[in-house]
Structure formats: C-alpha cells, structure tokens
Amino acid sequence: MTHSPIDVLRMALEREKDAVQYYKEYATGASEPAIREMFQFLVAEEVKHVELLQAEIDREVNQEN
C-alpha cells in the first residue's frame, strides 16, 4: 500500500499528539521535580512538532485546492 505525502504527515501528526499525551501523563505522575520538569520539556518539544506538522499539512491542503 502506498501513502501520499499528506497521509504520511497525518500519521506523523497523530503519533506526535500521542507522544504529547504520553509525556503529560508522566509529568503529572512524577513525584520528583527534576523528572516532572524533564517530561514537561518533552511535552513542549512534542507540541512544537505538532505545530510544525499541522502547518505543513495545511500548506499541502491549500496547494491541492
């Protein structure tokens, strides 16, 4: 099965969103401040990835129309 570039971007976007939720859960459950901060940092990084992928998807969709 072949996937279009936009399909691949959408799959990547979903994985990044999953990672955000995963790290948020661990940040919330962390009892040590250093561990909590590390997971909060990872959440922020994943949010950046979500934003970049969403912007690229939006560009691709606009080019198709």
Residue ranges and their predicted role:
Residues M1-N65:
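Non-heme di-metal
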